[in-house]
């Protein structure tokens, strides 16, 4: 009974302590990301925010190559965002930390990393296109992170913009519940204005002062706008009890104040029940100030997110979400500060590796410019210099004691009893709850990379190491057969950017070999074998006998045989031996026998193993790998080729030529829909192997009038003829 009372008292104190920590947070911070399909106007929107917030003195334009957030030479040259960039600015008493992310599928890893650091996002739609392919991808990523979001429908000044279609797309393609807080209107001369549904006002921007000022005119007599406001209140009252009570008590929508609507909309947005929709034209300087007002009003404060980290109390905790390399400052680590205070000269511990490092300097972010500060508080985003070993996904704490105490508090707050093997359970809790290791997508292409001279080999390896630390989706490996360094990447553009950055940033003019498709392999048939190995190594006898089976299975990678003759022996195996066997066996699946592709949808089943006394773990691991390699050759493998989902927008008169070309590329037409009166949208799946140089071919076929986007959508088995051709190409015989 005493123990129970003490536990109750401890949990009460823990809850009180958490409230104190929350009060230490600043409610005046908003950490947001901005997401979009390529060319929707995301970077232009960001540049306008910086300008109206007084952070920049002139408007940055993508086509002029003078943007703040697109600062890499490759970004300004191509007019696209490649690397996420962080900027900080103040707006109406709030401090906004904004991460501008890429829209191109080749750099989707940048988006994934950024979403670990934000509390909400703005999704920018092209008002002329609605929800596009990459919009779906970034929306799914935001769903995974359970992020509240706003939608900004951009380019609404254009004559072909369709606001209603965008709303339908949000509902049908993204399964969202949009709440329209604004509607478009146009003057007699075609200038875009905005109706504010909540305040019943019309907003009009002045073009002679770059959109700094705009006028508001009350429209209380507008029946149409009043109906829109009533519709908004009706939608919200069905989702928010507090607003519903007010509506019921007043028996009128007209008596619901703007403040009550805003509060209800904020609650529903933070709970991800609705998505407020705003509109404008970033390029024409329309609608940006209300968008920033909406960020302050509707997106959550830091204290409303990441509540799991309350267990750190006043101790420092932060998570690393990005690393960049600066020529003068060296590696710079972007850290989301979760709890406590970060100070210059502070000693930080990496929870994953137990390695301590010292923060030499702290900077406030503004893309590639930095303002040094002495300290920063929880809820903010900081750039740290001096952290040379930290990698993306690391949790940083002030000490080992702080980490252990936080893990104990978390377990106890959840009612978990402290087990006997405390360290093991705490390590599991650390991995499960405190790790943000991003899921790295599979490479789509790979190619060899060679330095211009032997003397440049070391410099090239160091440069690749730094680029890989910045970009986890860049794979770097060594082919022991050819002796070459091999790069794996997300697409042709990704590889081209790596080559360009090697030259511009590291002054190494590398040669890239021809791009190869990253095929996967799958099991041809089930097979079982026993491998026995006995060797004397440095006077020590090493022996192991292992029986493994390979079977087709998409669920489990490694399992134990359940047959009566083996189950007792296998259950008696030490966990360490099982771990070594698993690691060795699974490693052999990384390179299949046909083209060196990863072997997937295959289960390794352990039937029996005997390990001699004194046999080294490395010997057991090597034997397990050798046994699996032998089985793969015996059973044979089939190739799986990557399939791309393509969206093509083209004029009606060009469709027949495009369709004929697609049929020659083994493409599967999924859908063809109209876009206005003059264009059509073609949705198609096609093998990546058939799409080399397709963007150039499409420009030729359409005389430059068609546009396309594509992204990976899975793998598919190949027929015998195509598989044989792929093997010959991989072996350099065709």
From Swiss-Prot:
Source species, domain of life: Eukaryota
Residue interval of the organelle targeting sequence: 1-25
Binding locations of GTP: 36-43, 100-104, 154-157
InterPro entries: EF-G-like_DII, EFG2, EFG_II, EFG_III, EFG_III/V, EFG_V, EFG_V-like, G_TR_CS
Ranges where the tr-type G domain occurs: 27-303
Gene3D superfamilies linked to this entry: 3.30.230.10, 3.30.70.240, Elongation Factor G (Translational Gtpase), domain 3, P-loop containing nucleotide triphosphate hydrolases, Translation factors
UniProt GO cellular component terms: mitochondrion
Pfam family, one: EFG_III
PROSITE patterns xrefs: G_TR_1, G_TR_2
Biological process terms in GO annotation: mitochondrial translation; ribosome disassembly
Keywords attached to this entry: GTP-binding, Mitochondrion, Nucleotide-binding, Protein biosynthesis, Transit peptide
GO molecular function annotations of the record: GTP binding; GTPase activity
Protein location: Mitochondrion
Protein role: Mitochondrial GTPase that mediates the disassembly of ribosomes from messenger RNA at the termination of mitochondrial protein biosynthesis. Not involved in the GTP-dependent ribosomal translocation step during translation elongation.
Family: Belongs to the TRAFAC class translation factor GTPase superfamily. Classic translation factor GTPase family. EF-G/EF-2 subfamily.
HAMAP family reported for this sequence: mEF_G_2
UniProt name for this protein: Ribosome-releasing factor 2, mitochondrial
Species for this entry: Drosophila grimshawi (Hawaiian fruit fly)
């Amino acid at each position: 009974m005493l123990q129970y009372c003490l536990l109750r008292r401890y949990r009460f104190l823990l809850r009180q302590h958490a409230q104190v920590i929350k009060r230490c947070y600043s409610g005046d911070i908003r950490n947001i990301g901005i997401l979009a399909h390529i060319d929707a106007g995301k970077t232009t929107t960001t540049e306008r925010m910086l300008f109206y917030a007084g952070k920049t003195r002139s408007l940055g334009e993508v086509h002029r190559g003078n943007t703040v957030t697109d600062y890499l030479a490759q970004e300004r040259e191509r007019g696209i965002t490649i690397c996420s960039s962080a900027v900080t600015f103040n707006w109406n008493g709030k401090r906004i930390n904004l991460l501008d992310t890429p829209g191109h599928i080749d750099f989707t890893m940048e988006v994934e990393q950024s979403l670990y650091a934000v509390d909400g996002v703005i999704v920018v739609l092209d008002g002329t296109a609605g929800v596009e392919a990459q919009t779906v991808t970034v929306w799914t990523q935001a769903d995974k992170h359970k992020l509240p979001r706003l939608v900004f429908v951009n380019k609404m000044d254009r004559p072909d913009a369709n606001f209603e279609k965008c709303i339908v797309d949000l509902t049908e393609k993204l399964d969202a519940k949009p709440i329209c807080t604004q509607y478009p209107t146009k003057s007699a001369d075609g200038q875009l204005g905005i109706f504010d549904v909540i305040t019943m006002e019309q907003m009009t921007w002045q073009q002679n002062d770059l959109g700094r000022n705009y006028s508001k005119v009350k429209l209380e007599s507008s029946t149409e706008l009043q109906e829109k406001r009533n519709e908004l209140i009706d939608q919200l009252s069905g989702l928010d009890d507090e607003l519903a009570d007010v509506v019921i008590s007043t028996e009128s929508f007209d008596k619901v104040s703007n403040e009550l609507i805003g509060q209800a909309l904020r609650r529903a947005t933070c709970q991800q029940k609705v998505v407020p929709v705003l509109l404008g034209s970033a390029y024409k300087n329309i609608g940006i100030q209300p968008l920033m007002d909406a960020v302050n009003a509707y997106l959550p404060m830091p204290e409303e997110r990441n509540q799991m980290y309350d267990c750190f109390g006043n101790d420092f905790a932060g998570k690393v979400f990005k690393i960049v390399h600066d020529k003068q400052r060296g590696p710079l680590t972007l850290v989301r500060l979760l709890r406590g205070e970060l100070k210059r000269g502070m000693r930080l511990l990496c929870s994953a590796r137990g390695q301590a490092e010292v923060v030499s300097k702290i900077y406030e972010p503004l893309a590639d410019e930095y303002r040094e500060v002495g300290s920063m508080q929880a809820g903010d985003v900081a750039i740290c210099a001096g952290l040379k070993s930290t990698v993306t996904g690391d949790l940083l704490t002030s000490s080992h004691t702080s980490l252990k105490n936080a893990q104990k508090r978390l377990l106890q707050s959840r009612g978990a009893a402290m087990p006997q093997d405390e360290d093991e359970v705490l390590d599991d809790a650390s991995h499960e709850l405190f790790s943000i290791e991003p899921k790295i997508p599979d490479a789509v292409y790979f190619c060899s990379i060679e330095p211009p001279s032997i003397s440049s080999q070391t410099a090239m390896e160091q440069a690749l190491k730094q680029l890989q630390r910045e970009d986890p989706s860049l794979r770097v490996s060594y082919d022991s057969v050819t002796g070459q360094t091999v790069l794996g990447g997300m697409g042709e553009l990704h590889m081209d950017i790596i080559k360009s950055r090697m030259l511009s940033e590291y002054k190494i003019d590398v040669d890239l070999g021809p791009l190869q498709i990253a095929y996967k392999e799958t099991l041809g048939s089930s097979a079982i074998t026993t491998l026995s190995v006995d060797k004397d190594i440095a006077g020590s006898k090493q022996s192991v006998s292992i029986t493994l089976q390979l079977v087709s299975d998409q669920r489990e990678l490694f399992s134990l045989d359940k047959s009566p003759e083996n189950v007792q022996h296998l259950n008696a195996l030490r966990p360490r031996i099982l771990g070594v066997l698993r690691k060795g066996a699974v490693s052999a699946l990384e390179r299949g026998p046909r083209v060196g592709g990863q072997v997937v949808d295959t289960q390794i089943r352990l039937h029996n193993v005997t390990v001699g006394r004194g046999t080294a773990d490395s010997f057991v691991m090597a034997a397990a790998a050798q046994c699996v390699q032998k089985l793969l050759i015996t059973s044979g493998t089939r190739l799986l080729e990557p399939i791309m989902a393509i969206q093509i927008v083209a004029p009606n008169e060009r469709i027949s030529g495009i369709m004929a070309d697609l049929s020659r590329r083994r493409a599967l037409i999924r859908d063809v829909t109209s876009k206005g009166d003059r264009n059509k949208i073609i949705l198609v799946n096609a093998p990546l192997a058939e799409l080399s140089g397709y963007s150039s071919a499409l420009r030729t076929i359409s005389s430059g009038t068609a546009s396309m986007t594509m992204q990976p959508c899975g793998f598919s088995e190949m027929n015998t003829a195509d598989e044989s051709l792929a093997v010959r190409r991989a072996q350099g015989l065709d």
